[in-house]
A protein has these predicted regions:
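Short glycine/serine/threonine-biased micro-segments
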Residues: 2, 154-155, 162, 212-214
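C-terminal extensions of enzymes
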Residues: 188, 194-244
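Shared catalytic-loop signature of beta/alpha-barrel
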Residues: 75, 86-103, 108-206
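Structural signal for hydrophobic packing residues in well-ordered secondary-structure cores
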Residues: 47, 172-176, 211
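Active-site donor-binding loop signature of nucleotide-sugar glycosyltransferases
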Residues: 81, 183, 212
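Short loop or secondary-structure boundary microenvironments that flank
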Residues: 5, 33, 58, 129-132, ...
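Metal-dependent enolase-superfamily TIM-barrel catalytic cores that perform enediolate-based chemistry
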Residues: 1-98
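Electropositive phosphate-/nucleotide-binding environments in soluble metabolic enzymes
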Residues: 9, 13, 37, 85-88, ...
């Protein structure tokens, strides 16, 4: 589960405790310069065994390499997208300077990006978000490349409703997706969702993959209509929304 930047470390620790009680076992924390070392130190002191990763969202530059190296002390699963998303080359310069595995997210939009990143040694892990790369055609290409070349891979989401979430879950269940994925329970973002049944976190920190026909969930058209009506009434711009 992902946790954004909070007011202080104590607030972050409280949220982590809540998420762990809800069943999540892998914690991702957003970081930025000045909100990183102290945060990692505090989390490790409070939760020494938790599976922990940090997501920088391109907040650093290569000049911060010595600073980022300090994060090696906190047994991180990975650091995600530390440098600008459009600079795979700079990531290839950073990865040899730190022990923590770099994971590329926004940098990977095509299989060619993935191939270049691995060839240059810019990362050891790829976060594959089907919506980010244009859908499942390109996702499958990236997935196959990672599996064939032994690249660690996990599946992320982009605030999908149950329609997209069910497809992402099916994709995340493929062999070769080797790391915990960033797919949360339905009520983390939508309550209610436009589909039934909802996705829930099980005691072992997993979500059941849909097994019903089609995408595995049923679209609730009354909720879709409510969402469309809300958008028409409240968004400050008009959307080309078809009648449903």
């Amino acid at each position: 589960v992902s946790i954004g930047i909070q007011d202080d470390v104590a607030s972050t620790l409280a949220i982590i405790e809540k998420r762990l009680q809800q069943g999540y076992q892998r914690i991702k924390l957003k970081i930025k310069p000045g909100w990183d070392i102290e945060l990692a130190q505090g989390v490790r002191a409070a939760f020494p065994e938790v599976m922990l990763m940090l997501d920088a969202n391109s907040a650093y530059t290569l000049h911060d390499s010595e600073y980022l190296r300090q994060l090696d002390d906190y047994d991180l699963l990975m650091i995600e997208q530390p440098l600008p998303y459009n600079d795979i080359y700079q990531h290839s310069k950073l990865q040899p300077q730190i022990e923590t595995a770099i994971c590329l997210d926004e940098s990977i939009t095509t299989v060619d990006d993935a191939m270049l990143a691995i060839e240059l040694g810019a990362c050891r892990i790829i976060n594959l978000k089907p919506a980010r790369v244009g859908g499942f055609t390109e996702s499958i290409k990236i997935y196959r490349f990672c599996v064939e070349n032994g690249v660690a891979l996990w599946i992320g989401g982009m605030l999908e409703t149950g329609i997209g979430r069910s497809a992402n879950l099916a994709f995340a269940s493929l062999p070769g997706v080797t790391l915990p994925c960033d797919l949360s329970a339905t009520d983390r973002y939508y309550d209610p969702d436009v589909t039934e049944p909802p996705f829930v976190i099980r005691p072992d920190s997993t979500i059941a993959t849909p097994t019903e026909n089609g995408i595995g969930v049923m679209v609730q058209m009354d909720r879709v209509q409510q969402a469309v009506q809300y958008c028409r009434e409240h968004l400050p711009y008009s959307l080309p929304i078809a009648n449903v």
